[in-house]
Swiss-Prot record:
Region (Disordered), start-end ranges: 1-20
A molecular function (GO) term: structural constituent of ribosome
Biological role stated in the UniProt entry: Binds as a heterodimer with protein bS6 to the central domain of the 16S rRNA, where it helps stabilize the platform of the 30S subunit.
Gene3D superfamilies reported for this sequence: Ribosomal protein S18 (4.10.640.10)
Keywords associated with the record: Ribonucleoprotein, Ribosomal protein, RNA-binding, rRNA-binding
Protein name: Small ribosomal subunit protein bS18
Family note: Belongs to the bacterial ribosomal protein bS18 family.
């Protein structure tokens, strides 16, 4: 049961494509804070099932991801955003 040598963890038969690093949309806009009442902006960072998108998918920086998470949770608590969708 030996593995092929020289593969270096890559998928067989394909060329590795390096993806471009995502830029935080809030840093680009120079947003001072993320408003929990801005539902249209918050909906971009929530899946259709109601889960908050992680940083690696949304492309936000750590500071704005923390702020975004608390804004989404605050909007959920006052029923601006749903907890889940069915």
């Amino acid at each position: 049961m030996s593995r092929e040598e020289g593969n270096n963890g890559r998928r067989p038969g394909g060329k590795m494509r390096r993806s471009r690093k995502k830029v935080c949309a809030f840093c680009v806009d120079k947003a001072e804070f993320i408003d929990y009442k801005d539902i249209n902006k918050l909906r971009k960072y929530v899946t259709e099932r109601g889960k908050i998108l992680p940083r690696r998918i949304s492309g936000t920086c750590a500071k704005h991801q923390r702020e975004l998470t608390s804004s989404i949770k605050r909007a959920r608590n006052i029923a601006l955003l749903p907890f889940t969708t069915e």
